[in-house]
Structure formats: C-alpha cells, structure tokens
Amino acid sequence: MKKMILMSTLLLMTCLVQAQILNVSPTLKKGNVMTYKSTTNVKASGTDVTVTENSKYTVTEETKDGFVIDMISSDWNVNSDNMVSHLLVAATEMVSGINFRFITDKSGQVKSIKNYDEVKAKMAERADKLIEGILKDMPEVGQVLSKDQLKEQFMGATTEEALIKSIKANGVLALNGKAIASGAQDEYVNSQGMKMKRFFLVNGKKVTSTSTVNMTQDDMKKMIIEKVEQIAPAQAQMVKDNIDTLMESGLLKAEGTEKSSYELADDGWVKTMTMESNSKVMQQETSTTQTITRQ
C-alpha cells in the first residue's frame, strides 16, 4: 500500500513538472538598460584561452510589432598569447564597440538587425586591418590561406542570418519568445556549424537544456567539405573525391554536446547563464565554457 502511495505521489510530481510551462517574455519598455559580464574559456589545439567582456542591452524604441534593443559589447580581455588567442582577439575586435540594433517582437525574440548594412560595413573594414595583423604576426597562416580566403572566413560568420542564429543559440536573448515545458525540444546551429537538437527541463524560473548533434550523413558531409574548403582549400578536392571513404574511416567524424543553464530574474531577463560545450570535428577537440552574469 505504501509503495502504491509513493508511486502515485511520484507520478503526480512528474506530471506537475511536465505540465509547467515557462513563457519567456522579459519586461521591455523604452529606456530599459541591462548590463552583463561574460567569461568564456576555450580549450583547443593544446591551448587554454579565457575571454572576458561586458555587454549592454538598451531598449531604444517601441514599435507596433515589438521593440528595438541596442546591444553593444566592450572591455574585451584575452589572457593568452598563442594562435587560438590571436584568432579569438580578431573575432572579438570585429564586433567590439559596434552597436547592434535588434528588431524584436513583443516577447523580445530577435527577428532582424535594423542597422545590418552599417554593421556589415564596419566589420568588413575591421576585417581587413585584423587580417593584415594576423598575417604579419603569424606568417604560417598565410602559407595555408590567402588574405581573401581569410576575409571570406571572417565575413561568412557575419551574415545577418548567421548573427541571428548565433543569438538564438545561446545568450541573453536566446530564450525570448519561447514557451518552454520540460521535455520540449527545438533545433539550432551551434558555433561549430553543427545542427543540434535541444531538450529542455524547467524548474520554476530555471531552465536547463541539453543538446546533441542532429545531422544526417549528407549534412555531415556537406559541413566537413565546407570546413575543409575554409581551412585547407588545397585539399578540398581530394576530400570531395574521397568523402565516403574518409567518413567510414572515422577521420572526419563530427561529434558534439552542449549543456546550458539559465536562471531568469522576476522581470524575465536572464539573471545568470552557464554553458558547457564539447565538440570533436576532424579529430580536433574543442571545449568551451561560458558564464554570463547580470550586473
């Protein structure tokens, strides 16, 4: 009898947890300002790099359909001096100090970038200067990739679509507009270019998500070829011609997992976020941890 009561209680608790739905719609009003500090640690190619930054989100406009949220990052700091850190510095300097004007719906979900043409022009200008510095400081990079190929890599990650996908993957605005229940799932593309399936668990104002790779064999082949074309264009044709054999060998296998935890404040804005990501693409392992804290 006691066992039956216990089982009934556990079943009821499970149903209550599953029935809980968290609608993420932060308080938005013209003039609202939120500031955050972010610390990101990246381990790759035998290196360990930590990047810190501050970011400010300001609701600058109220529109018929939603809002405009300005986001600007500053005070970037990188603690290491190696190839990975140089590339991270280049990536951060591409966006540091640039004001991104996100057009959102009523719930704060990002739909487009109002000043994208201006943002793109500034990033392209910075890319030229940064690439010159990279080729000067790391001439070995120039032996593999030309200046044009490097710029193509930098700018490929800065299309409006790519930037919005990045925002919706992880970060302060990632959950906005979602009605999340335990067991719910969605899909996104992570920073490594892998399609991921994400599962959610809700507990009050806390949301945990666990993500795994969700790619077909054809998706995997396409991603691998694109990456080879970016980092080793001279070998791209060889990889294309032998892609099936290479995939079967496991040399080009791509794996990845991500786990994120969000805690929302009473106003619906993110209070804290932590993210752990591990990936292995073409035998190269990368581990990333990130913490974002509201100030």
How should each PLM-predicted stretch be described?
Residues 20-105, 179-295:
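Acidic, serine/threonine-rich low-complexity disordered tracts
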Residues 2-5, 34-36, 137-144:
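Aromatic-residue detector
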Residues 115, 121-232:
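Acidic, serine/threonine- and glycine-rich low-complexity intrinsically disordered segments
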Residues 105-106, 115:
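Mixed-charge, low-complexity intrinsically disordered regions
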